[in-house]
């Protein structure tokens, strides 16, 4: 990143801090996850959960969703102004699973949002601790990225389902702040912008008046976030055009879709963070670990270490494969849904299979599912090695344009080639290079054509033994060059429905 000087690291975004040195960052990230852990322990006490029940990932998700809902100002305000039948705007809750007489039971709980907010603040030294909330949102987003496909959403905005690797963070709420913006993929930003432009086309007042002025500011801010993800001058120049448009319309949508396609080869920089379920932080705090004193990082060895020593359980449906369920959660924990499977498999130490071959549905259990036949098993979340998370797209030759893979956005900073079907991608760029962005389009296509799939990304970067916390001895894996490793290959996952 050329502009590193002006950017805050993503731990700083995560903790809302100003520029800090490495030690301060580690301490404030530690304070953040420690607060999540303390909150979780307190909730388990409130709900009288046994140790086993407190380690159940479904219970963790319910508790996380409750605190996110309790702090969702906008939605709370909306619910109070538009009362709907059977929904108390002041309460929040969800399913809690308990072990009774050798069976799993579902119990629906309801809490005052005010009470949840009080417990959360108490766990976070009396502060609102927005960073911790964002952290939980990103964990949920990473879980969705690994679990669901967004084909429908892509098609609806006129994009190609093959662009799924650009959709990281597509289910993050609007209020996820700078840390949320950092982990959104190029496709996610493009989709948000297209939705906005379409509203403007259908509703003449969208850009007008006092509200319209605010809308326009939001539009420009989103354009700048997307521009910051691109690494080539031509892509950035095109984003300036889109942002400065007086009255955004179909021309801008065309430009954005063109840019999204180009990102399959000229990849954007998208941050990756290992965000773990609240119960994992809770377990560590309960065992006496002091996160703030020890310091913590979302992009180094710490999450791997934490998962090495945590035992988390999950409910398993009758015909699901527990190993596959573990893979799903492992990928979510490391934000690796869009990583090359060759790299993930090497780090994890067991083969990571494409989603089309997984015999498992999502982690959450719907309220109409039969609990009688539910079983539970231990999630295997340990890894053989650890690697540093990246925020670059892995473009080679001086971080300019390089081979993308039609479906990879690297998570780990580990040397590999990025095989891609240039023919498949370039086929999407026939025709339209006229209009005001013609010279930029031509330049982008030229860069894409000169990209070579055999180029090596992250030259010399490797994985590390779990005993090597200072990252002194990189082990550079060698991969079978021909074998491309997309997780979405032969995909049959369910769609994400809100």
From Swiss-Prot:
Q: Where in the cell is it found?
A: Virion; Host nucleus
User: What protein family does this chain belong to?
Assistant: Belongs to the influenza viruses nucleoprotein family.
Q: What is this protein's function per UniProt? A: Encapsidates the negative strand viral RNA, protecting it from nucleases. The encapsidated genomic RNA is termed the ribonucleoprotein (RNP) and serves as template for transcription and replication. The RNP needs to be localized in the host nucleus to start an infectious cycle, but is too large to diffuse through the nuclear pore complex. NP comprises at least 2 nuclear localization signals that are responsible for the active RNP import into the nucleus through cellular importin alpha/beta pathway.
A molecular function annotated in GO for this UniProt entry is:
structural molecule activity
Q: Which UniProt key words apply to this protein?
A: Capsid protein, Helical capsid protein, Host nucleus, Host-virus interaction, Ribonucleoprotein, RNA-binding, Viral nucleoprotein, Viral penetration into host nucleus, Virion, Virus entry into host cell
Quaternary structure note: Homomultimerizes to form the nucleocapsid. May bind host exportin-1/XPO1. Binds to viral genomic RNA. Protein-RNA contacts are mediated by a combination of electrostatic interactions between positively charged residues and the phosphate backbone and planar interactions between aromatic side chains and bases.
> Which biological processes are named by the entry's GO terms?
symbiont entry into host cell; viral penetration into host nucleus
How does it get modified post-translation?
A: Late in virus-infected cells, may be cleaved from a 56-kDa protein to a 53-kDa protein by a cellular caspase. This cleavage might be a marker for the onset of apoptosis in infected cells or have a specific function in virus host interaction.
Write down what this protein is called: Nucleoprotein
**What gene makes this protein?**
NP
Chain positions of motif Unconventional nuclear localization signal: 1-18
